[in-house]
Structures are given as structure tokens and as C-alpha cells.
Amino acid sequence: VELLAQRRLRRVLVVTSTPVLPQLGFLFEALNHAGCVIISSPPVDQEPTVAIFEGVLQKARDEAVEAVLGVGGGSALDVAKLTAALARGGQPVREVLGINLLQGRDLFLVCLPTTSGTGSEVSPNAILLDETDQMKKGVVSPHLVPDAAVVDLFLTLSVPPAVTAATGLDALTHCLD
């Protein structure tokens, strides 16, 4: 919240999933206290498709957001990262699928992970499911690396034990790679 206040960023899009939302009361209270207007995106409750992403992107554009706050697992964080990169630019998402095709990012971006598997909060990658061919496609660009990543232990408690176990094993396999 301090990072947003220091930069006088007031219109903040929060990208998260439905299960995480009840845990964010403290965060919303802090944002309100800092004078921020909280804009909630449509929830990212599954692997994000291009259509789900485009709905979030449209909300960001309609609300003229100044910053994006991603809270959740890899899916929510990937959507937050892409939204921050494409909200003010003219590039369509299908044009940036691939490596180093993203032209930049104008919005300040903070990610708060609730899981440990993907590392999305610090990576230059984002994954979307393309409904046209049912293939997962990636965007790889240094412009996707968030300005800040904040790990809050209490947010990890919002995740069901089975998801914690699965993402923990995912993190372990990444270490072994």
C-alpha cells in the first residue's frame, strides 16, 4: 500500500479469485485508508482463457486504472501482469503471445502470491488458454516482471490444503529443474 501511496496512484485494479476475496478485508481497508479507489476485476477462478483476460483488461480500461494489484495463485497473477502491460497500449493480447513481443508496461504492478508453485510473482512469463485451439500459450517479456512482490503468510492460509500440497510439489520440481 505504501508503494502505491508514495507514487500517488489512486485507482487500483485488484485481480484475484473468488476463494481469496474473503481474505482481503485488511488489504482493502489499508487501500481505502491510503485514499485509493479499489476496482475489483472479474474473478480469475480457473486457468485464464483469452476471453477471461480480455474481460479483465476491458474493466481496467473502462475504469482508467493507474495500478494493478494481483493477489492469488499463478492464474490471477498472470492476468494481473498482462493487464498492467496491455491496459494503456494498443497491442491486442494475441499479438503478444510469444517471446519478447510485448512493447512495454505503463501501469505500476504489485503481486501478492497465495501459493508457491508457479513463481509468477517474480517471473517474466504469463500463460493463457487460447480457446480457438485449446492450447496454453505464453507471453515472455521482461515487461511482465512486477514492480514489487509481497509475500504475506496470512494470504497463504486462504488456500485449501490440497492446493498448498500441489503447488509445493510444483515448486520442488522447479527447484530440481
Predicted regions and their residues:
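A glycine/threonine-rich phosphate-anchoring loop and its flanking beta-alpha core
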Residues: 88-177
